[in-house]
């Protein structure tokens, strides 16, 4: 287990697609569980595109200061790091169909970590 954790930590630093794949799988699984539903199908089917296409899509929405090196970083300051954010929060889902639609790639955006964690949270802004 220690080896696996160290391996994944190192791979996250060197292979951004590996990092995206892990984070998106966890993000989608957790959002479905929070609404008391079960994940049915593969992550890419729910997402609506491959992980490579998702990476390209997110990069097309980057602000000038965003890159994969500052993804997930947070120190309480604006424009320090960014998170993957659901544009329409999954907490607003009222049904299984809605939660699946809200996990489509087109409902994701890169958002400043400060804005996402302090201002937006589970709100639509």
Language-model segments: what does each one mean?
Residues 1-83:
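Contiguous alpha-helical segments
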Residues 117:
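Short Cys/His-rich local motifs and their 1-3 flanking residues in nucleic-acid-associated proteins
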Residues 66-110, 121-123:
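Histidine-centered nuclease catalytic patch
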Residues 58, 124-125:
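Intrinsic structural disorder
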